[in-house]
Amino acid sequence: TIDKFNDYYVIQISTLGMDQYRDLIVKILVEEYNAKGVYERSDIKTREIEGLEQRKGFLTEPFNTDVEIIENGVKYIVDIENGQKTGFFLDQKENRAAIHKICKGRDVLDCFTHTGSFALNAGIAGAKSVLGIDVSQHAVDCATRNAELNNLQDIVKFECHNAFDVLGTWSREGKQYDVVILDPPAFTKS
């Protein structure tokens, strides 16, 4: 996997075959794509199946690993060093854009919020209120920072909860939302 965040690249290599081309990949990213920096996030267990150690770190000169990006009109600070996978799920771009069509004037709950991307898109789209929850305090802190970056802190809030624990309780308490976003982590690894 190669993810591009402005002029910075994050690579994640899971197989022995691609691992042998790491240096060439970095060289091409720097020389042909003018990468300002390349960071490796091959800190995944699937590498062990191929007899590879997990790896994480700079493949060029060090740089600030909090990279600001804009997607669908929403600003994010992506933590490519400590965020999940490569720091941001770029493949969800169109799903985040689709949120705009259903959230205006609604109360929204975003479970497993991670960087707050779905919650922030709901806020930008004009949601009445948004609550994003995640089991990781680090994720909640990053999402809160992203809400502040977009001046959405009055509408979009984040709390540290395990969705599996609180959803049943909230249902019994009568808490209701107009839109509930569920994007849980993978339950099985391929």
Regions found by a protein language model. Give the residues of each.
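Flexible loop residues that form catalytic
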Residues: 14, 43, 185
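Carbohydrate-binding surface patches
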Residues: 8-13
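Helix N-cap motif at beta-to-alpha junctions
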Residues: 16-18
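Non-catalytic substrate-recognition/targeting regions of SAM-dependent transferases
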Residues: 3, 21-88
